[in-house]
From Swiss-Prot:
It comes from Klebsiella pneumoniae (strain 342). Catalyzes the NAD-dependent conversion of D-erythrose 4-phosphate to 4-phosphoerythronate. NAD(+) binds at residues 12-13, 318. This is D-erythrose-4-phosphate dehydrogenase. The keyword Magnesium does not apply. Homotetramer. The keyword Cytoplasm applies. The record marks 182 as: Activates thiol group during catalysis. The gene is epd.
Amino acid sequence: MTIRIAINGFGRIGRNVVRALYESGRRAEITVVAINELADAAGIAHLLKYDTSHGRFAWDVRQEREQLFVGDDAIRLLHEPTIAALPWRELAVDVVLDCTGVYGSREHGEAHLQAGAKKVLFSHPGGNDLDATVVYGVNQDELRAEHRIVSNASCTTNCIIPIIKLLDDAYGIESGTVTTIHSAMHDQQVIDAYHPDLRRTRAASQSIIPVDTKLAAGITRIFPQFNDRFEAIAVRVPTINVTAIDLSVTVKKPVKACEVNQLLQKAAQGAFHGIVDYTELPLVSTDFNHDPHSAIVDGTQTRVSGAHLIKTLVWCDNEWGFANRMLDTTLAMAAIGFRFDA
């Protein structure tokens, strides 16, 4: 069965979801029937075809009135600001991928369901009242048919959660800290301009900028046993894509750096293949652009202090890796069925 999806919000993640769908060869499993985006149709087509981070899309893209064509596939374009007014029932939408980065509450999810969608997947963290939060590769098996409003967590949560799980299972984590070194984002300024966060009033291309992060809460949402045992900070750096995460954890069992690397490399080749990758090459951030993994461990940067403090550096393409996980989670949601169809 082919899953019929609609995308609400066609920004960085929405466009990368479409690109990833076509590049990964999963069109027999997923069909995009509609895109809802307030921008004009010409702009939608142009930014899908040409991308500063990921290059020119290999597929032919054209726009005819309110239809977007990718190859021979026609996708209906909508410009509807009110979720409840979207024609999901008419279009027989199975799963809405809400990639606005704005909506994430149960109320917004239920509006999609009332419009006729069978299930909703948010591309960002949602509230505690959602049916589930999924980090694919770790907890997608906990999905149930009655889980209709789901969050795919965040790109950084998807990056770090598999590594935390591996280290905890092997050595027993007592506590940890996380520093996210994240590329600049759309909520920053090109030149100095007003913003409620005074640090984000400053030009994104000229400074390393500390910002707030809810990553510690995201870790606890997946692993409640770590409540009050993880802290996180984040800085934005003057690059346009790819993120590095510095993870430090204290563990119960004594360990050596080489043993940590052996554990993570084995996982990348085995149980976490396709989700986690491992490298010891002398690479930099641009080398991980367009990498589909959630996390790439840089084994050259692993350190252990006093046998119980582990430090690792983990890379991710915060756009491309996450877009691929959106597709994975969509398929997982569809595979368990639609118990409460609208």
